[in-house]
Each structure stands twice: as structure tokens, then as C-alpha cells.
Amino acid sequence: MTDGSSLEFRQGPISQSTGTISPAQFRHTISAFHCEVIHRGVRRLPCDNKATVTNATIEALLGRRSIRKFKDEAIDDDTRATLETVAQHAASSQFLNDWSAIRITDPAIKAKLAEFGHQPYIATAPLLYVFVIDEHRNARIAERKGIDPASDEFHLKYSYRFTQAQNDAVLALHAMETAAYSLGLGCVILGSLLNNIPGLIDVLNLPEYTYPVLGLAIGKPDQNPTVKPRMPRTMQFFENTYPADADGVLDQLPAFDEEVHRYYDLRQADRPVDAFSDQVATISRQDVSHQTLLDKAAAQGFRLDQ
């Protein structure tokens, strides 16, 4: 190809870093499509969502996939500093800089986070961060300007600021993740750390007006999973208003269900994943009543009822 990337068509079993898929998997896969495209080392399945304009940044974003197995190699300090600086350059609502990220290097804390997330690879991630809402720093700054954070005058503890700070933390994490992918590193976002928010707050010694948002593990990839299928754009992008015809939005759902069902997740490499509709139905019935936000945020000083 003219851009120097490689394009390879395979009609044999698709090799994973963990081995070769079974004949049954191969027959299931090959019946739906006849080749796999290897572009810049990233495996992609055919789909209708084509990017007709491209550059290195777009390629990094289109190749985004969660990496859950890393090589036992440290990330050098210059790369780490660059990733942290990139995160700082993400958008920040009203320039409040109301997030922080805690880098976890203590093996005991890593092990605890792996326990919270029920994911052993967290304990061995070369780079591990927990991004948090941080109005604690701003509360101290406001206090120096004569504002009592405990008073009603201090508005950074209310729901609007909480959600804006949460957004800022996610934007910073995504900037770091994208930069890491552009450098050939792999990442996985760790929402599973929120399985035990009180425990996470305790082990990270999070002060008042802080709250955990997400974790991010980074390292040199030791696996090469296929990029997950994406929903057809017409199901997710609308013009001017939300479509009145809800059923029309779902016209392409059967085809998307089939495409998702053909995908193999390395975590369960012996079977295809469930169709998207089935996943939605299953998750919609999961009881998450124990994951209440108001009381946990209130314990950190936030007042989300206002």
C-alpha cells in the first residue's frame, strides 16, 4: 500500500497470541466473511462504518481495542511524563482542572485494586492510574480566598460541578489512552474498580470532595484482539432532532446483531459473544441497586441532591 502499511488477507484460522482458534470457530467465522484485514498490525473485521479520510490520529482511534495482557516491560519515564502531559491538555470545564490521577506503583495497592475489579491483570499492569474527581484542591484554593467550603457559598460540591468534573476526568483519561495507542502501547479502561467504591476511597486515601471515576492500565501489548464491531452510524448519529420513528432507527439491528455475534472475545475465545440485543437484555436485568451514588458521594462531602 502507498502509505507503507501492510495489507494481508487470510483464509486460514485466525491466530491469537494465546493460540489458534478451533476448527469450529473458524467455520463459524469463515461462513460469515472470507477474509480478515490486517492494517498497521491491527485486526479489523468488515463493517459498513468506513473512514474515508485518514491520518495517524484517526488510525490510532479506529484501531482502539482493550488490551488485557501486557508484556513484562516497564514504560520509560519520558513516555510516562508525555502521557501525563497529554492528559493535562484535555478540555476542562471553566478551566477548573477539577480532576487528578493517582499512579499506582505499590504492589500491595495494585493487588487490592485487582481484587476490587476481579481482574488479576490489574496487579501486573506496567502503568496503572485511577482518575478521580478533585474538588478538594479547589476547596483549599477557595479557602485561601476566604470562602468556607462547608458553607452553602461553596458550589463546587453540588451536582452540576460533580458531573462536570466527572466529564473532565473522562476526557483526560481518553486523551492519555489515545496518546498511548498512538505510541504503540495498549490500554484497558477499568470501570470495574468501582465495584467497591468505599474500599477504593479507603485504599487511595481520598480526601473530602474527591471521588473515583475510572482506572486506566497501560503497557506494551502481549495480545492482538480484533477490533469490536461498531453500531451502524445511522443507529447512533441523527440530524437536528431525535428520530420520531424509533423502530426505523433499529432497522439495521438484525445485521448488527449478527456481526456482533461473529466476534470472538479473547476472554472467552472458545465461543462467539452474544448478539448485541441479547447483551442489552441481559445487562438491563442486572441488579445494580447496591451501586448507589448519592450516599457514597455524600460521604465524600458532595451534595448531589442540589
Show where each model-derived region lies.
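Cationic, low-complexity basic patches in intrinsically disordered or flexible, solvent-exposed regions
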Residues: 9, 17, 26
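Short, low-complexity, intrinsically disordered N-terminal modules
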Residues: 3-6, 11, 20, 31
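N-terminal cationic leader/targeting segments used for protein routing and processing
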Residues: 15-17, 22, 50-51
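Charged/polar low-complexity intrinsically disordered segments
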Residues: 11-16, 36
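Acidic, surface-exposed loops and disordered segments
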Residues: 26, 30-306
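Intrinsically disordered, low-complexity segments enriched in serine/proline and basic residues
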Residues: 4, 15-16, 43
